[in-house]
Every structure is written in structure tokens, then in C-alpha cells.
């Protein structure tokens, strides 16, 4: 692990609770797509955030931070970012990184800002294996929480092997996509997941249910399912 000092180069409020933050580390850095960093608050307090940027983007690190009065843990990090414009990070962490040696079709599943984890893997896969079949499911409470959906739709125009399925729990009048939970959508769309590499990010309970149901009902292999949650559940 390496500790780096990072200058905060930009902060964008992309929804009422999600911030896109770009960091400029003071030294070269290495990580694998799907890994995360720790923001060092003090010697005993380090807080994890997935990197939304890719390993090939050497000039910056991008984070998507969901922070609000209901999430004071992340809000304290945002307060420091906004106040000090400099943070220390510990990098890299996590074992749920993208397995590039596999040729299996990819299933990427994200809930909320778990998208940052799948974004890094998605962009890396398209860059290094541009013909690999990829299905990307992104779930949010409302359509506004699928904040980078326009970027994903542009990617589907460039890569016919990429399928993006957005899912919202509460649809509004202008919503034309799927409604419900992201796991329900996956189960409806796949009769078998036997040969898929599955990467999942979101609430721990979602990851737990996904592993149980995908393995028991859709023949998925637990050894081919990746997510930081699986280190803890």
C-alpha cells in the first residue's frame, strides 16, 4: 500500500447527494480496475471509496461520493475535501478487481454509487477487450440517481456488444425503462448465469441475496462472483 497526498482538482455536485471528485496525486500510483482507496482522516480512521476512473488514466483519480445528512461518514470526507482541497489516500485496496484473463461474458451490477466500482471495470473491459459481451445493470431509487446514464448510452452506440439496463424503484412520468429492483431485473432476464463473470457493488444485503439466488436459481458459480461485500459476508 502507498500513502499519497492528493490535490482536489474538481468537485461536481451531480445530484443532490452525489459528488464527482477528481484528485491529483503527488506521486505515480497503480491499481487494478475494481479496487478502492482509503481516505485517511487520521491515523486510526481510514474510509473506503471505489475508484471510478481506470488504471490507464494516470493523471487523476475520480471518485463518486454519496454524501448527505443521512450519511455523515461520507459527509465528513466531503467536508474535508471542500474545506482543505487536499486529502491523503492509501492505495490500493480490495480483491474484487477485474479478471482480465477471462473471456467469459461479463455481468456488472450496481446499486446507487456502487456504479463507480462497475464503471472502472466497464471502461477497462471495453478498452482492453472491446468485443467481450457485457451486460450492465444499474439500479437507483429514482431516475435522477442514475447520474451517468447518458455516458453509458453513448457507449452502447460505440460497442454493440454492450447492453445497459437501468432500473429505478420509483418511476416518474418520463421514465421509459425498467421499474423494481436491479436483482429482480437480472433474474427476469437470465435463465442461466453458469458461464458469466459477475461483478457487483451496492449494499451488502443486496450482494448477499444476489450470491444466494444467482447460485441456487441461475447456476452461477460463487467463484466467478466478485464484490467487496463478499469479503465481509
Curated annotation (Swiss-Prot):
Keywords: FAD, Flavoprotein, Luminescence, Oxidoreductase. Pfam families: NAD_binding_1. Gene3D superfamilies: Nucleotide-binding domain of ferredoxin-NADP reductase (FNR) module, Translation factors. This is NAD(P)H-flavin reductase. The gene is fre. One of its GO terms (biological process) is bioluminescence. InterPro entries: FAD-bd_FR_type, FNR_nucleotide-bd, OxRdtase_FAD/NAD-bd, Riboflavin_synthase-like_b-brl. Pyridine binds at residues 111-115. Belongs to the Fre/LuxG FAD/NAD(P) flavoprotein oxidoreductase family. NCBIfam families: PRK08051.1. Involved in bioluminescence. It is a good supplier of reduced flavin mononucleotide (FMNH2) to the bioluminescence reaction. Preferably uses riboflavin as an electron acceptor when NADPH is used as an electron donor. It comes from Photorhabdus luminescens (Xenorhabdus luminescens).
Amino acid at each position: 500500500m502507498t500513502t499519497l497526498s492528493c490535490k482536489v482538482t474538481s468537485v461536481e455536485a451531480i445530484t443532490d447527494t452525489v459528488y464527482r471528485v477528481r484528485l491529483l496525486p503527488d506521486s505515480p500510483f497503480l491499481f487494478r480496475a475494481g479496487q478502492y482507496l482509503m481516505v485517511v482522516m487520521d491515523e486510526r480512521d481510514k474510509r473506503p471509496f471505489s475508484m471510478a476512473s481506470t488504471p490507464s488514466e494516470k493523471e487523476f483519480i475520480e471518485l463518486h461520493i454519496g454524501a448527505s445528512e443521512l450519511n455523515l461518514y461520507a459527509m465528513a470526507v466531503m467536508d474535508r475535501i471542500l474545506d482543505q482541497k487536499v486529502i491523503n489516500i492509501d492505495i490500493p485496496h480490495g480483491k474484487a478487481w477485474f479478471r482480465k484473463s477471462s473471456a467469459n461474458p461479463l455481468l456488472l451490477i450496481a446499486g446507487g454509487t456502487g456504479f463507480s466500482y462497475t464503471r472502472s471495470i466497464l471502461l477497462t473491459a471495453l478498452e482492453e477487450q472491446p468485443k467481450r459481451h457485457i451486460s450492465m445493470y444499474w439500479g437507483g431509487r429514482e431516475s435522477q440517481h442514475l447520474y451517468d446514464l447518458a455516458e453509458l448510452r453513448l457507449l452502447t452506440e460505440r460497442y454493440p456488444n454492450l447492453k445497459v439496463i437501468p432500473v429505478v424503484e420509483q418511476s416518474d412520468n418520463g421514465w421509459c425503462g425498467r421499474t423494481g429492483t436491479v436483482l429482480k431485473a437480472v433474474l427476469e432476464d437470465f435463465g442461466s448465469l453458469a458461464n458469466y463473470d459477475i461483478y457487483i457493488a451496492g449494499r451488502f444485503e443486496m450482494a448477499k441475496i444476489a450470491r444466494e439466488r444467482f447460485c441456487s436459481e441461475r447456476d452461477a458459480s460463487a467463484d466467478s462472483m466478485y464484490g467487496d461485500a463478499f469479503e465481509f459476508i
